[in-house]
Amino acid sequence: MARSIKKGPFVDLHLLKKVDAARSSNDKRPIKTWSRRSTILPDFVGMTIAVHNGRTHVPVYVTENMVGHKLGEFSLTRTFKGHAADKKAKR
């Protein structure tokens, strides 16, 4: 179910403070965050945010098309190694 419009988008305050500080100082370094649940706001466009996927921080460059989505959508947590090959097909 979608979030109610009257509540507005959710963004962790510590992430918002980091983005504002980076904007004011014109800093281009990636902002490291564990907040996968935060919604991408128009203020984030053009910034690189390193989102934690459970193991490492994955750098995500935010574009206009990403506004309204969650940060966790762009940092995959699972790696698919492929199904086991059929032994009969190898012969």
Swiss-Prot record:
<dbReference type="InterPro" id="IPR005732">
    <property type="entry name" value="Ribosomal_uS19_bac-type"/>
</dbReference>
<keyword id="KW-0689">Ribosomal protein</keyword>
<dbReference type="GO" id="GO:0019843">
    <property type="term" value="F:rRNA binding"/>
</dbReference>
<dbReference type="InterPro" id="IPR002222">
    <property type="entry name" value="Ribosomal_uS19"/>
</dbReference>
<keyword id="KW-0694">RNA-binding</keyword>
<dbReference type="GO" id="GO:0000028">
    <property type="term" value="P:ribosomal small subunit assembly"/>
</dbReference>
<dbReference type="GO" id="GO:0015935">
    <property type="term" value="C:small ribosomal subunit"/>
</dbReference>
<dbReference type="GO" id="GO:0003735">
    <property type="term" value="F:structural constituent of ribosome"/>
</dbReference>
<comment type="function">
    <text>Protein S19 forms a complex with S13 that binds strongly to the 16S ribosomal RNA.</text>
</comment>
<keyword id="KW-0687">Ribonucleoprotein</keyword>
<keyword id="KW-0699">rRNA-binding</keyword>
<dbReference type="InterPro" id="IPR020934">
    <property type="entry name" value="Ribosomal_uS19_CS"/>
</dbReference>
<protein>
    <recommendedName>
        <fullName>Small ribosomal subunit protein uS19</fullName>
    </recommendedName>
</protein>
<dbReference type="GO" id="GO:0005737">
    <property type="term" value="C:cytoplasm"/>
</dbReference>
<dbReference type="InterPro" id="IPR023575">
    <property type="entry name" value="Ribosomal_uS19_SF"/>
</dbReference>
<dbReference type="Pfam" id="PF00203">
    <property type="entry name" value="Ribosomal_S19"/>
</dbReference>
<comment type="similarity">
    <text>Belongs to the universal ribosomal protein uS19 family.</text>
</comment>
<dbReference type="GO" id="GO:0006412">
    <property type="term" value="P:translation"/>
</dbReference>
